[in-house]
Every structure is written in C-alpha cells, then in structure tokens.
Amino acid sequence: DLAPGITLDIMTPSDVSFLDVERGKVDMVINRFDSMPQSFHQIHLWDDTFSCILNVDHPMLENFTLDNYLAGDHVWVSKTGMGVGVGVNPDDVQRLGWVDLAINKLGKKRQIRVFTRHYQAAMTLAEQNDLIVTLPTRAALLKRDNPRVVLRDPPLDIPPLELKMAWSPLLQHNPANRWLRKLIADTARELDGQEPTL
C-alpha cells in the first residue's frame, strides 16, 4: 500500500472541462487529446493500437474482411455515450472517432447500433450479441481469457492513439500531485515495455 489514505475520483472525459484542470480542481487528465491549452504540462504515457472483440459465435468470425466488418453491427465507445453531432453541452458534441476517421478515409461507413461511454459495457455487449467492438488493444486485452469472445486485428489500418497525461501549471510543484504523476508515469512505462499481444 503506497498511499493508504488516498481517495481517487475517476471521471469520464465528458465530466471534466479543461477549465477545471486549468484551475487545479482536477489533479490530472489522462486521455488522447486532439488539442490542449499550451499552459498545461503533459507527458506521453503510451501509444496503443486497436483490436476488435466479437463473440465466439459471431457469423463473421470465419470471414472477417473489411466488407463484412463494415456490414456488421458495431458498438461505439464515445466520450458522451452519444452519436456524432449529439451532446448536452455544445462543447462536448462528439466528432468522428479514431476508428471512424480511418473508415471515412476509405470513403466508407460502418453501422453503429449502440453508443456507450464505457469500454466494459461495450465489451459485455459484444460478448452477448453479434456486435463488433473496436477499441484500444490494452482495453481489449482485459477480455483475452474470456472463452466467450475472440480478439481480432481490425481489417483496416487505424492509426495508433497516443495516450497522454496533462495537468495544470498550478499543480506542477504540488508534492502529492507530483508523487501521483510519477507513480502513473512509472506504471505506464512498465506497461509500455510489455507489448500487447492478441
């Protein structure tokens, strides 16, 4: 037990604004960022590829081609849990995700049937239905030993995502925050040294 008195409040990206981080109300954010205020401190944690999860009885398993992938029914994990162009706060409106940007570059679209904010919910849905979930490999590996699912490489090139940790300049020298950032960075380096394998 490195910090027996610590309390963690882990939130999804749509629950936090950059203003909360900037003011030091949030200790740090860990995510992929398309853009970030220049005043924030940040470090790279790791790069991740993508994997697909399908249930063992999925009819496309034997012929997991791009055309079949696109014709299948998908679960999309988005920061809002809602589709493109939908959001309670206009600043949180979801744009195309990493996977759909790669598909869009091919001039194609996929059939998204379920939107959720949670990887675990998406993986459970794929386990119990004929749905395809495409998500970061490190998340997919949580189901590696589950006999009800199969992990596959996506049948298209999806650029890897870069996971970063960012925090406010107000917390740069805070001893508790520095300790936690170091612990997270050290753990990420340890994990990054272990190549994810399907």
Mark where each language-model region is.
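Residues at or immediately flanking beta-strands
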Residues: G5-D9, Q111-R113, V150, E162-K164
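Ligand-binding "clamshell"
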Residues: M36-T49, D130, K143-D153
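Short Pro/Gly-enriched coil loops immediately N-terminal to beta-strands
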Residues: F40-N55, D67-G72, P154-E162
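Hydrophobic hinge/microswitch elements
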Residues: P13-S17, E22-V26, V88-V150
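Secondary-structure junction motif
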Residues: M60, F64, L70-L106, N174-P175, ...
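Short secondary-structure boundary segments
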Residues: F33-D34, V56, G81, P136-A139
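Central regulatory/effector-binding core of bacterial HTH transcription factors
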Residues: D1-P37, T116, L198
